[in-house]
Amino acid sequence: MKRYFKALGYLLSVHVLALLVMTLFRLVEFIALHGMIVDAGASRVMAFVKGVWFDNVIACYISVLPVAVLLVAASLGWCHRRLLRGINIWYAAWFAIAFMPSAANTPYFQYFFKNINSSIFGWFGYVATTSGMLLQESSYWLYIALYFVFTGAFIYALIRLRRYFEGLFLLPKDNMHLVLVVSRFLISAVMIGACLFGIRGRMGYNPIKVSQAYYCEDSFLNQLGINPAFNLLTSALDDMRKENKELHLMPYAEAITNTRQWLGITGKVDSTNILKREVVNDSLVMKKNHPNVVVILMESMSANLLGTFGNQQPLTPTLDSLYHHSLAFTHFYSAGIHTNHGMTATLYSFPALMFRNLMKGTVTPRRKGIATVLKQYGYENMFFMTHEAQYDNMKAFFQTNGYDDIFSQENYPKSEVVNSFGVSDHFEMGYALNTINQKAKTGKPFMATILTVSNHPPYIIPDFFKPKTKEKETQIVEYADWAIGDFLKKASREPWYKNTIFVIQADHGKLVGKSEGELPQSYNHIPLIIFGPGVPQQQYAGLGMQVDVMPTLFGLMNLNYEYEGFGVDLLKQQRPMVFYSADNQIVARDHQRCFVYNPSMNRSFCYDVLPNGNLKETKQESKFQDLKNYVFSNIQAAEYIERHQQ
């Protein structure tokens, strides 16, 4: 039995070695991000214990075939060197792949405050852009290097283990007596069964889920225990399940009825266009000389970065000044946490459906929005982006849905491209200004949408710009704010400026400071600033969201239009609540409460909003039923439109 147990010893040694490496990756994440911990009393050790549990699932997935092959072969007395070397190659290849999400998870979590998931596959269609982002952002280099160091050390240890056990396999063959052979097969069956049980992760009706990692009130520690490869694998499998391709939060009929009621839509429901209605503004004051419109979507500009909202560093003097001299919104929220969500919500009044990209598809989706309505009024519509036009299917989507001209990296000098996301904000805005000036000379009204991207890794700050802060992450915010101010200063000298309404907002926020709940508020709380002719200077303290931009803007412009969106004119109708998404979570909130729901976990998180704006978790879920109904209804109605009205 000696050779058999040596084979078993080899398998167990590799398994333990793999668990050790995955724990090291978790330790790196803990060291790098431990400042995110808000529950001082929560056990740190338990996160690592939970982590080994989840790591073991991945290790068992990889080990089940080698365990079966090697132990069966050893049971029959056959342990050839070639077999061991083949198994070693198997382990090296698959664990090298499994370690990748663990290495990438630290910077990913730092940016998104959630573990790496299937949403990253949306980046795979842009290999050059994605690889450029990874290689050009210096803060990622450490984790790339650690991946190669840890993986290299693992493979080196594998080779040493193989050589050690190869020598032991030179021992005389095990006795092939029937009883001993049967005994070895029984032990093999137990080990294979143990491996399969490790894949399942737990006893009971359901296999292990991410919810098993939750043990305290701290969101970072709860997620620290989840193996990134496990999270990536299960989220991808969830995407492929038929029942998860279509959201089933509540019956469609109930959701549509509720949503129409909240939006003030009356009359019979048209199943082919459930939210269609005619919006009639005051035609008596409708201007014959329609104002131009400039919409600026700022990358990751969380409200928490503004001094107006309490940031102690002087990062955004331009936005802070505009905020106090414009129509500004205090409690305004993004539809999601990705740029494509911000664009479809702001420009087309359609909410985010968790992590789906609603602009992509073999057949380009059709939407009615700001550009399509303005086109009916004779506007020329332009869209400016820093990167390639094909990114996220932008060129096809926007040209299909109301935009006449798309300006992108393909239009700019190659010498101005600074990273994988194209040109810097100031160059893009300078190019946009020159183009707008030419367009204005035609005498036709225009709409220009400018999407910035500088406040997204890799951060590139022009040499001429001299920031006041020391950290690159805050310096880039200073630069982005300056670029807006420089654009507006130069635009103010142009004849078209006085007849132009400007809309400035973020596409979404980002993590600023610590998260006091399951989802950082700073990720969706964003500024919205509107100014121009006929726009009142006031601070709007009610609730608002990106889908409200279109009806609010058209209300200010006194335009009549056919509307199919989820928004309301905030100057005429107050929202009792808002709702939004964050990849695998959906949220509803009002001024006093915040409700977060994770459909894959079927778990709710309920928070009271404290006077200082922070969140405090509460277990009194019954008090949040109206918020739950609000977000479930709106998301389910959006799901219906996405599936039945395209």
Give the ranges of each region predicted by the language model.
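Charged, low-complexity, helix-prone segments enriched in Lys/Glu/Asp/Gln
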Residues: 30, 109, 164, 218, ...
